[in-house]
């Protein structure tokens, strides 16, 4: 049995294949996933697992250089937005780098998911609980 943080074989595999600037999406239960993009569906029921639970596990193994959020999260889900900013701050300290945070419209966000290596769908059912993570390097 694997001893590391990520036990899900699909998530572990996609993270291990990421190169510098490749992207990975963690999303809520409602984000449409392009047919051309690998979907890793973790959703069991509403809220399980939560967006933050999935993000915590993914970022424990992934070196993150940039995070992209929909601008709408600021107005429509401010509590999660603040939680995300705190998570990114802690991740910066753990990784020893600065993580750039970019905002885009939700429509542009959805278009950008088509270029991602995979979309990991959580059971989250709150608005705009989505993030695009851009891979950094560990050296």
UniProtKB/Swiss-Prot annotation:
One of its GO terms (molecular function) is monosaccharide binding. It is found in: Cytoplasm. GO terms for cellular component: cytosol. Pathway: Carbohydrate metabolism; D-ribose degradation; D-ribose 5-phosphate from beta-D-ribopyranose: step 1/2. The active site is at 20 (proton donor). InterPro entries: D-ribose_pyranase, RbsD-like_sf, RbsD_FucU. GO terms for biological process: D-ribose catabolic process. Substrate binds at residues 28, 106, 128-130. Disulfide bonds: none annotated. It comes from the Bacteria. Its EC number is 5.4.99.62. Keywords: Carbohydrate metabolism, Cytoplasm, Isomerase. It catalyses: beta-D-ribopyranose = beta-D-ribofuranose. Gene3D superfamilies: RbsD-like domain. Transmembrane segments: none annotated. Its main location: cytoplasm. Belongs to the RbsD / FucU family. RbsD subfamily. Homodecamer. Catalyzes the interconversion of beta-pyran and beta-furan forms of D-ribose. This is D-ribose pyranase. It comes from Enterobacter sp. (strain 638).
